[in-house]
Amino acid sequence: AKEKRYKELQQFEFNPVYFGYNEFTVDSSYTDYLKRVCRILKSHSDLRIKIIGNTDGDGSEAFNLELSKKRSNEIKLILIKNGIRTDRMIEEYNGELHPIDSNDTDEGKRKNRRVDFSFI
């Protein structure tokens, strides 16, 4: 069982959930992916998940921190609707502090408007 678990977790790849400008609504194109995350959490009852909200650099730091919180919370609500208990989730709100690309281009900003995940 340990080997099966290890293999399943090794094969699973987290992808960011991206958001529109000033948006915190999760696009329906992510539904299947988020259900897959929930299936893995359900099949490994000791796993927990960290949900990490991020924004681009537009707007004030305070505004972006709040927006990253809203993005993280939207994901949390989806996981709850799919049967994941809140005590298995940790939320982190980075605002604009951890960009993965430049905030000087539209493409870079798009990549920074995201929620990342990790198992813990």
Segments predicted by a language model, with ranges:
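Periplasmic OmpA-like peptidoglycan-binding domain that tethers envelope proteins to the cell wall
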Residues: T25, S29-T31, I52-I120
